Amino acid sequence: MPGITREEVAHLARLARLELKPEELEHFAGQLDDIIGAVARVSEVADQDVPPTSHPLPLTNVMRPDEVRPSLTPEQALSGAPAQEQQRFKVPQILGEE
């Protein structure tokens, strides 16, 4: 299997909105090759006889019942906010900007 190219790393970086330097492209290309190789080795071992798992140990969620408790009033919650609007925290817009 051919290795990951600098162009492929640059494409992935653009998709992730990352700006990488040329030397970082080389570095990450090597790292991605190592990761893909490790996944390929695991795929070779994984067989129909091996059940898929998401964790090596059995896990169970510990749930507790929801309880309604007193909480902060909107005024108390917003008392330390640098900016607020209509009983909400006002923050700088980040989506939709280029």
From Swiss-Prot:
It catalyses: L-glutamyl-tRNA(Gln) + L-glutamine + ATP + H2O = L-glutaminyl-tRNA(Gln) + L-glutamate + ADP + phosphate + H(+); L-aspartyl-tRNA(Asn) + L-glutamine + ATP + H2O = L-asparaginyl-tRNA(Asn) + L-glutamate + ADP + phosphate + 2 H(+). It is an enzyme of class 6 (ligase). The keyword Translocase does not apply. GO terms for molecular function: asparaginyl-tRNA synthase (glutamine-hydrolyzing) activity; ATP binding; glutaminyl-tRNA synthase (glutamine-hydrolyzing) activity. GO terms for biological process: glutaminyl-tRNAGln biosynthesis via transamidation; regulation of translational fidelity; translation. Keywords: ATP-binding, Ligase, Nucleotide-binding, Protein biosynthesis. Its EC number is 6.3.5.-. InterPro entries: Asp/Glu-ADT_sf_sub_c, GatC. The keyword Nucleotide-binding applies. Residues 47-98 are annotated as: Disordered. Heterotrimer of A, B and C subunits. Belongs to the GatC family. Allows the formation of correctly charged Asn-tRNA(Asn) or Gln-tRNA(Gln) through the transamidation of misacylated Asp-tRNA(Asn) or Glu-tRNA(Gln) in organisms which lack either or both of asparaginyl-tRNA or glutaminyl-tRNA synthetases. The reaction takes place in the presence of glutamine and ATP through an activated phospho-Asp-tRNA(Asn) or phospho-Glu-tRNA(Gln). This is Glutamyl-tRNA(Gln) amidotransferase subunit C. The gene is gatC.
